[in-house]
Amino acid sequence: MEIVQEGIAKIIVPEIPKTVSSDMPVFYNPRMRVNRDLAVLGLEYLCKKLGRPVKVADPLSASGIRAIRFLLETSCVEKAYANDISSKAIEIMKENFKLNNIPEDRYEIHGMEANFFLRKEWGFGFDYVDLDPFGTPVPFIESVALSMKRGGILSLTATDTAPLSGTYPKTCMRRYMARPLRNEFKHEVGIRILIKKVIELAAQYDIAMIPIFAYSHLHYFKLFFVKERGVEKVDKLIEQFGYIQYCFNCMNREVVTDLYKFKEKCPHCGSKFHIGGPLWIGKLWDEEFTNFLYEEAQKREEIEKETKRILKLIKEESQLQTVGFYVLSKLAEKVKLPAQPPIRIAVKFFNGVRTHFVGDGFRTNLSFEEVMKKMEELKEKQKEFLEKKKQG
């Protein structure tokens, strides 16, 4: 056992292995620090929004680090409910709550199966649920949606990025009933498929799970949703389901909402058009929520520098919410550009914004044809420059 510090919290954890697996009885993954930073900031947003004490749930708690940080680092938690089916996890959680001197009336520790914990004990009672399963969150979504109060927030993590991003398309179809696209913006496609699934599962109960933030990092996706009720709100979300048609030859892409408007061939090069979806084609970021996360993170010393850097990038990205983005190196390779310009220059050239998904990725409102035309223009300018340089 060893003691580690994260944020303000200190916790006892088993010795951290090089490889994390679901077979471990209790684990603490230091690589998920940014994820937990975001969960704390998301809860603080809810504190400010509601202006009252809140109840939070961590149904797959493991070491208890999330629930402990929620109690120590936010301003409104009345009580945190930490749950894990592992008896070893329960022992470690108890030690960790004591280690941080948290009063016993501010938390409860339970050892139930996560769905049972969410449904049986506190139906419609939680203001904030942080769900961080090992793998897909699908088996827990309905229980989470039913356990939350109206206006509550779900902080959701998914680590099964391989199926969602196209490595295992059949698995993606079974779990999410959608086709992934293994292209340069495959992780965004995966996030949009996951959002669609969350909305779909909650919609069965006339619950609207409205996406307000999306983030892709390392091996996981991080999403936030606000819970609302009413068939009109649910229908409005479902209206924002659609498909992406993509050409793997020329990188052309089109968003389609009408099944009758599918194209078999790419109108740009004539190659086969592939289909991704159904998926969410609406906004990935609520500007108010995203701006709050960024601004709150800058004020806090306990928040990682990496978290602050990522939030700055996402804050800028949220100003231009396209479906899909372009990767400069892929475009440069396609048109045989003599020299790839720095991404900061390319962003200005395309009137776009950088994306957090890929280091040299950018979003733009320009059409695919306009993007390729500007790439050809850039190519000609570079050729002229190199020719002049050659001539002295």
From Swiss-Prot:
UniProt cross-references to InterPro entries, sorted A to Z: SAM-dependent_MTases_sf, Trm1, TRM1_arc_bac, tRNA_met_Trm1_C
Catalyzed chemical reaction(s): guanosine(26)/guanosine(27) in tRNA + 4 S-adenosyl-L-methionine = N(2)-dimethylguanosine(26)/N(2)-dimethylguanosine(27) in tRNA + 4 S-adenosyl-L-homocysteine + 4 H(+)
Disulphide connectivity of cysteines: none
Mutagenesis or variant effect for residue 192 to A: Decreased tRNA guanine-dimethyltransferase activity
Effect of residue 84 to A: Strongly reduced tRNA guanine-dimethyltransferase activity
Sites where the protein binds S-adenosyl-L-methionine: 36, 66, 84, 113-114
Keywords assigned: Metal-binding, Methyltransferase, RNA-binding, S-adenosyl-L-methionine, Transferase, tRNA processing, tRNA-binding, Zinc
PROSITE patterns given in the database record: SAM_MT_TRM1
Pfam families according to UniProt: TRM
EC number from the UniProt entry: 2.1.1.215
Trm1 methyltransferase domain residues: 2-375
Effect of residue 219 to A: Strongly decreased tRNA guanine-dimethyltransferase activity
GO molecular function, one term: tRNA binding
Stretches assigned to coiled coil: none
Role of this protein: Dimethylates the guanine residues at position 26 and 27 of one or more tRNAs using S-adenosyl-L-methionine as donor of the methyl groups.
Stated family: Belongs to the class I-like SAM-binding methyltransferase superfamily. Trm1 family.
Protein name: tRNA (guanine(26)-N(2)/guanine(27)-N(2))-dimethyltransferase
